[in-house]
């Protein structure tokens, strides 16, 4: 894995991330393919919208279809028919989401499988082994996603456990012979001091890239931005920086301004299935009756397949009748919008005009 930083504009960064299965231009947005598929999208669709990299989920793929199936295909790329780069989350967030169904110990996490009720045990070593079989281009360490809200003592204990797991993840990754990139994850909740301690510990271990985790878990937007502004400047300048699970287009523009390079979020695909379309002037909610006779495309400035061929009225009709095509067309549009956004951001940074772009973007989407 190799990261090249080409240009900065303020704190915003323009780079190139060279991975085993291809090159990712940064800043980049990664569509989420939890089970090895971005919902309603084929790999060919993802290429058309210019997605450079997709995200898969270690936890869910481990449970279903299981490692035996994926290993028989030689890894996740061939299994899902995608020949570009893949980043896999370690499973820490999904285990966190199980709540009372899981028990955390120093060794790892014991939980009941949401698929069949079997007792499962996931450790840093097992997470690294799974991701080695998946052959993901970027592997995430196994960590504990700190719940929100939580007091400083509880968050501190969680962060320290994640650091110990980070060291075990690094060791297992290296001893297993995995040559793909391994990213550390900064935790520490809403406490700047704990975030600093987490980052210092990760830097001592040493990783190929660094992520900010534990945000977008229910905290107020102001707290998310406060922690981002505090943590991002301390991340190594020569390594890729990944903000996990964030977010809206406005969140991404704001995070790029703080120096972040990589993003993932389910919002564009989930909202598409619910009839919410992102446009240059804000969000369209297709179920609203105001679109019943609207012959305009969803976004008159958009050149995606959906906007070139279909009206808001037709998309409204598909949403109202529950047609599967509606979810597909909406997803095509939203992911195209996100990829176009990232392309515009990259161009603005290259031209030294990112601040002006960000101001114009925020003004336009707020109007």
Curated annotation (Swiss-Prot):
Class of the enzyme per the UniProt entry, highest EC level: transferase
Functional note: Catalyzes the base-exchange of a guanine (G) residue with the queuine precursor 7-aminomethyl-7-deazaguanine (PreQ1) at position 34 (anticodon wobble position) in tRNAs with GU(N) anticodons (tRNA-Asp, -Asn, -His and -Tyr). Catalysis occurs through a double-displacement mechanism. The nucleophile active site attacks the C1' of nucleotide 34 to detach the guanine base from the RNA, forming a covalent enzyme-RNA intermediate. The proton acceptor active site deprotonates the incoming PreQ1, allowing a nucleophilic attack on the C1' of the ribose to form the product.
GO cellular component terms given for this protein: cytosol
Family membership: Belongs to the queuine tRNA-ribosyltransferase family.
Residues where substrate binds: 89-93, 143, 187, 214
Cofactor: Zn(2+)
Organism: Nitrosospira multiformis (strain ATCC 25196 / NCIMB 11849 / C 71)
Record protein name field: Queuine tRNA-ribosyltransferase
Enzyme Commission (EC) number: 2.4.2.29
Reactions this protein catalyses: 7-aminomethyl-7-carbaguanine + guanosine(34) in tRNA = 7-aminomethyl-7-carbaguanosine(34) in tRNA + guanine
Coiled-coil boundaries: none
Binding annotation for Zn(2+): 302, 304, 307, 333
Keywords of the record: Glycosyltransferase, Metal-binding, Queuosine biosynthesis, Transferase, tRNA processing, Zinc
Gene that encodes the chain: tgt
């Amino acid at each position: 894995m190799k990261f090249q930083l080409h240009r900065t504009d303020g704190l915003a960064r323009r780079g190139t991330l060279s991975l085993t299965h291809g090159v990712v231009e940064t800043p980049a947005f990664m569509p989420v393919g939890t089970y090895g598929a971005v919902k309603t999208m084929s790999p060919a669709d993802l290429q058309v919208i210019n997605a450079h990299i997709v995200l898969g989920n270690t936890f869910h793929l481990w449970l279903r279809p299981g490692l035996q199936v994926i290993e028989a295909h030689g890894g996740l790329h061939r299994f899902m028919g995608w020949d570009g780069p893949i980043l896999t989350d370690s499973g820490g967030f999904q285990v966190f989401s199980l709540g009372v169904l899981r028990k955390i110990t120093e060794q790892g996490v014991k939980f009941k499988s949401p698929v069949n009720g079997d007792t499962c045990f996931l450790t840093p070593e097992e997470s690294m082994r799974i991701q080695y079989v998946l052959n993901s281009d970027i592997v995430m360490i196994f960590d504990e996603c700190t719940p929100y809200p939580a007091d400083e003592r509880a968050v501190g204990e969680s962060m320290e456990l994640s650091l110990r797991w980070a060291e075990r993840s690094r060791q297992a990754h290296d001893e297993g012979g995995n040559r793909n990139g391994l990213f550390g994850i900064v935790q520490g909740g809403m406490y700047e001091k704990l975030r600093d301690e987490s980052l210092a510990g990760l830097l001592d271990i040493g990783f190929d890239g660094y992520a900010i985790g534990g945000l977008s878990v229910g905290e107020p937007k102001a707290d998310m931005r406060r922690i981002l502004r505090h943590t991002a400047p301390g991340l190594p300048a020569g390594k890729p920086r990944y903000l996990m699970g964030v977010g809206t287009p406005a969140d991404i523009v704001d995070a790029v301004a703080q120096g972040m390079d990589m993003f993932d979020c389910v919002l564009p695909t989930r909202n598409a299935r619910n009839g919410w379309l992102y446009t240059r002037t804000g969000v369209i909610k297709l179920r609203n009756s105001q679109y019943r006779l609207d012959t305009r495309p969803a976004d008159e400035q958009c050149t995606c397949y959906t906007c070139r061929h279909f009206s808001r009225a037709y998309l409204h009709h598909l949403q109202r009748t529950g047609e599967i095509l509606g979810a597909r067309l909406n997803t095509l549009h939203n992911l195209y919008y996100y990829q176009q956004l990232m392309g515009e951001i990259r161009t603005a940074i290259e031209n030294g005009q990112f601040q002006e772009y960000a101001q114009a973007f925020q003004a336009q989407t707020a109007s």
